[in-house]
């Protein structure tokens, strides 16, 4: 992780301690910090156990209805929520594991990662970002995203 990215991640973590959080801005800051173009934030509806879209960027409008509500275990976000760990693809376009839903390929992104928003082992949602090129996220990047997810969870409880 570069110093620039480290400072940006620190700035994101600091912003998550504010009382009035703009989730769209948080997502845009994360996308920028990790040199990505696309992203989503889903919050877990504790009553229905469904992930509900809270913020998105770079998603084609016709796909929004398909990812507004995601069941646990479906697609990258749903699997990250189910496993409570990061789910990553170097190239979503060529993936044939079944993890990515068919509609996900219509985003035209390649390197992508979804991380759970966890606090003390409890799921609060997911954060997903992607690049338009094949990419493997580093362990430092995964850890930073998980830390951001933890701080997002704390912010939801504040």
Tell where the protein language model's regions lie, with residue ranges.
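Regulatory sensory and allosteric helical modules in signal-transduction proteins
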Residues: 44, 61-94
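Signal-transmission linkers at sensory-effector interfaces
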Residues: 1-21
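Regulatory loop-to-helix N-cap segments in sensory/regulatory domains
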Residues: 2, 130-148, 155-158
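Sensory-domain boundary capping and coupling elements
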Residues: 77, 117-131
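A short, aliphatic-rich beta-strand micro-motif
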Residues: 110-118
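GAF sensory/regulatory domain recognition
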Residues: 41-64
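Signal-transducing coupling segments at domain and membrane junctions
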Residues: 60-63, 90-111, 131
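Short, hydrophobic-rich beta-strand element in sensory/regulatory alpha-beta domains
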Residues: 27-31, 37-45, 78
């Amino acid at each position: 992780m570069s110093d620039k990215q480290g400072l940006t991640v620190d700035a994101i973590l600091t912003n998550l301690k504010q009382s009035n959080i703009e989730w769209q801005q948080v997502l845009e800051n994360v996308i920028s910090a990790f040199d990505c173009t696309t992203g989503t934030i889903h919050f877990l509806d504790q009553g229905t156990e469904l992930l509900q879209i809270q913020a998105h960027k770079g998603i084609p409008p016709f796909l929004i209805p398909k990812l507004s509500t995601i069941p646990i275990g479906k697609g990258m976000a749903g699997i990250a929520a189910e496993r409570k760990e990061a789910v990553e693809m170097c190239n979503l376009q060529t993936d044939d594991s079944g993890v990515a839903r068919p509609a996900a390929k219509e985003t035209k992104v390649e390197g992508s990662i979804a991380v759970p928003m966890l606090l003390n082992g409890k799921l609060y949602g997911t954060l997903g970002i992607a690049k338009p090129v094949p990419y493997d996220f580093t362990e430092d990047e995964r850890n930073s995203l998980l830390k951001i997810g933890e701080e997002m969870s704390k912010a939801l409880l504040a």
